[in-house]
Amino acid sequence: MKKIQGGVTAPEGFLAAGVHAGIKKSKKDVAVIFSEKPAVGAAVFTTNKVKAAPILLSMENIKDQLISAIVVNSGNANACTGEEGMLAARQMLDETGKCLGIPISQILVASTGVIGVPLPVNKVLNGIRMACQALSREGSGAAAEAIMTTDTVPKEIAVEFEVYGKTVKVGGIAKGSGMIHPNMATMLAFITTDIGMEKELLQETLREVVDESFNMISVDGDSSTNDMVAVLANGLSGVWVESKEEEAYLKFKNALEYVAICLAKAIARDGEGATRLIEVRVVNAESLQKARKIARTVTSSNLFKAAVFGEDANWGRIITAVGYAGEEITVEKIDIYLGKVKVLQKGVPLPFSEEEAKEELAREEVIVTIDLNEGDANAVAWGCDLTYDYVKINASYRT
């Protein structure tokens, strides 16, 4: 497997575009992704009980066997907007279907931005028309820009691998910066591939991959009303997968997982106001569930995140988060490392160099390892530090 250029348009048969429709003052705000051959679609949606209109429509459409397009607007979430919001989301589907000549049941729709504000429908529909006209094999970067809200950088990646003498590609774009918390919430990610497989297998694979990637990130502990991860597989590589035992499936899942983790880490790294990425590794746990729960809990701890920002080796905040994660632990078995600096052994503090620990916490990517010494299950979660700028950004988000 190797990294390539092209994002969501790297796989065969995919086009994309991103345009400025006027929802935002000057930046791109409407994106369309289109598969020239109807693709098998799979998706995972936010677990927030309050779901935006586009999410409800996409949850219905994903039941269809085939998905040909994804339409997205940023700058307005179209959430908590009542019947007017549902009508607006349907109009987005109608306009996209008309422009591309496809059934509206083959379209996923997504929105992201401020909650509770009516969607400026005419601007969005005009943007959809412009985006459909601008669709190209080079449009992934523009689409990645058009789905951004408080993101500081667009997020896209693509990889390819060889199997059965053919080349398979997987590409993706994502957005997310604030309101990021585990359990499939607060971000959008769209992944394309030219491999072919049945819907049930694709959906199962996506769910497993999401649990290892997007569900393992946290920026601020808030779960959004709008977010989803979707994957479209159009089969144009000529490689068709029927079972999990096949070499092609194993290579595809590995590629999908790589793309998803790269996008998830990019979201965590770009957390609102963040200055560094935090990676928490929980090793030698009794179960995968326990390892994941503890890793997510530590990355979500505001006290720990603030300590990382201040380069303060306050490991007490880590062990405290381990303790309130809701899992059975034996403190006397636990070791904790800040990078390479061991600060806790068998539940007892060790003397360590504050300077060395500070150096570890000053890195762009801070790694914390929590060894439970009780089993063989491991998990990794990602987050970011908590800074003054996070408060500044969110104190005036609407205005």
From Swiss-Prot:
Domain of life: Bacteria
Protein location: Cytoplasm
Keyword Metal-binding in record: no
Keywords: Acyltransferase, Amino-acid biosynthesis, Arginine biosynthesis, Autocatalytic cleavage, Cytoplasm, Multifunctional enzyme, Transferase
Catalytic activity of the protein: N(2)-acetyl-L-ornithine + L-glutamate = N-acetyl-L-glutamate + L-ornithine; L-glutamate + acetyl-CoA = N-acetyl-L-glutamate + CoA + H(+)
InterPro entries xref list: Arg_biosynth_ArgJ, ArgJ-like_dom_sf, ArgJ_beta_C
Protein name listed in UniProt: Arginine biosynthesis bifunctional protein ArgJ
Species this chain originates from: Carboxydothermus hydrogenoformans (strain ATCC BAA-161 / DSM 6008 / Z-2901)
Gene: argJ
